[in-house]
Amino acid sequence: MTAPNHNWRKFKNSFMQTLTFACAILVVTPLVLVFYHLIKEGFSSINLAFFTQLPKPEGEIGGGMGNAIVGTFVLLGQAAVVGVPVGVLGGVFLSEYGGTKLNWAIRFAADILNGVPSINWGIVVWGLLVVPMHTYSALAGGVVLGMMMIPLVMRTTEEVLQLVPGGYREAALALGISKWKTIVQIVIRTAMKGIVTGVLLALARVAGETAPLIFTALGNENWPHKLTEPIAAMPLQIYNYAIGPYNDQHRQAWAGAFVLLLLVLFINIGVRFLTRDRFKPKT
């Protein structure tokens, strides 16, 4: 009886090990396929003109996505201005002034907002800014991306602040330091790497959004000049070129998708760099 039971346990162990390995491969496979196709279709189309020139009129060959690349960074900068202060301060409130029903409601609302489809955000900001201003604009695009960042930044900030040992707070208060100074000078400084990590993850999430920008930024064939004018962005340009009838536009859409993927990849590498010490074994 002992030998069959031992063999059965070995079989179950081998089966589960193989199953989990297969699932791990399935997780990695889509990423490999995405990289393969983007490199195959898009890398050959990347040159200096792609980064420095404006799009050519439809039907003409050449040009680039310089305006869309600049526009993407403009929108991300605005999104950070809108989303980071509100998200971080909201996370501080939830972490340091917690324990109330209001906090529970705020956490619940933030979790719900994290799952709201991005097109809904675009429709809301379209009604709040685009309609009253009578124009699509870079301002509206930055606001919608910033609003999408807020719940994610808030929740990640709350979580990293809660990892700060309570003894730090107690020691500061025992020395007569006020609570707000304790939070700003000790708690936030201690958790700064985690807060920056949350901000970068939120930026990586909104960097590739297209649907909300269709309702707010719209797109533009020229370089960005004013925040009150429509602005180009890489996700918008990729979408418009992908559905276009011209092969050269399709080629540039692949190149734009490859560059956008690299942008998100670099942001995630930055996150890994900031958090590398957190996972090292302590001696």
Language-model features, listed with the residues they occupy:
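Periplasmic/extracellular loop-to-transmembrane helix junction in inner-membrane transport proteins
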Residues: 3-19, 36-79, 99, 237-251
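C-terminal transmembrane helix and the adjacent membrane-cytosol boundary/short C-terminal tail
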Residues: 15-18, 158-162, 200, 240-283
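Interhelical loop and adjacent transmembrane-helix boundary motif
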Residues: 58-59, 213-261
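Hydrophobic alpha-helical transmembrane segments of multipass integral membrane proteins
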Residues: 70, 74-82, 86, 90, ...
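Transmembrane-helix boundary motif in ABC transporter permease subunits
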Residues: 78-110, 123, 272-277
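Generic hydrophobic transmembrane alpha-helix motif, especially the helices
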Residues: 111-147
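Glycine/proline-centered hinge or cleavage motifs at structural transition points of membrane proteins
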Residues: 117, 175-176, 189
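Transmembrane alpha-helices
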Residues: 157, 179-216
